[in-house]
């Protein structure tokens, strides 16, 4: 966190258990403490799993939080995405994030449409994992997401690109609906 703050970059902190694609093996109490320490060190926002005790603790503290849900196996249907979004929004986060796994490019486009349909009050972050989802990672901000996710180094999720690749190769900050078609 301190490294990104010293470089003038915004920072999002996430610490996940293995069942959610991470490597953290500690308790939810430990995770809540680490999240709080990250905020105190300068993290702008925390990304936690929907329904987790750590997410509930951070919301109770009125900490800046993104509530997220990942599906490492499949793409959710349109109605399922809407239902999950409604249930997540009720929790009162700063933003919600849904990231299913795409097996087709059409499914990646479905995620971009989901982002575009966001209510004004709670921003949506949405893209798809997997090789077929990579394009949605690049285009999600074009369709209204406040941020996208990239790695500093090796990918930590299927289809994830490095920050260097997003900025230099794909020039993600220059994309708009005219340049992305």
Name the predicted role of every residue range.
Residues 1-41:
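N-terminal active-site wall of soluble small-molecule enzyme domains
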Residues 1-7, 49-63, 76-79, 103-117, ...:
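Active-site-adjacent beta->alpha loops and helix N-cap segments on the catalytic face
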Residues 6-22, 61-71, 120-126:
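Short beta-strand/loop segments at the ligand-binding rim of alpha/beta enzyme cores
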Residues 8, 40-44, 59-67, 90-95, ...:
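Glycine-enriched alpha-helix->loop->beta-strand junction motifs that scaffold or abut catalytic
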Residues 14, 35-37, 41-55, 66-77, ...:
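Catalytic beta/alpha-barrel core
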Residues 27-37, 76-87:
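Short, acidic/polar
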Residues 28-32, 65, 84-85, 114-116, ...:
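Short, hinge-like loop/turn segments at secondary-structure boundaries
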Residues 106, 110-181:
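C-terminal alpha-helical cap/extension of soluble enzyme domains
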């Amino acid at each position: 966190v301190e490294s990104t703050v010293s470089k003038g970059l915004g920072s999002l902190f996430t610490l996940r258990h293995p069942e959610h694609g991470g490597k953290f093996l500690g308790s939810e109490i430990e995770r809540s403490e680490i999240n709080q320490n990250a905020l105190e060190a300068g993290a702008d926002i925390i990304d936690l799993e929907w329904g987790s005790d750590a997410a509930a603790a951070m919301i109770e503290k009125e900490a800046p939080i993104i509530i997220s849900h990942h599906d490492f196996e499949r793409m959710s249907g349109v109605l399922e995405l809407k239902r999950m979004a409604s249930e997540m929004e009720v929790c009162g986060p700063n933003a919600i994030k849904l990231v299913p796994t795409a097996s087709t490019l059409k499914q990646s486009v479905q995620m971009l449409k989901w982002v575009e349909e966001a209510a004004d009050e709670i921003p949506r972050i949405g893209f798809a994992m997997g090789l077929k989802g990579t394009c949605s990672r690049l285009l999600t901000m074009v369709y209204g997401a406040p941020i996208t996710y990239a790695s500093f180094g090796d990918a930590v999720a299927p289809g994830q690109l490095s920050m260097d690749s997003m900025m230099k190769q794909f020039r993600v900050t220059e994309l708009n609906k005219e340049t992305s078609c």
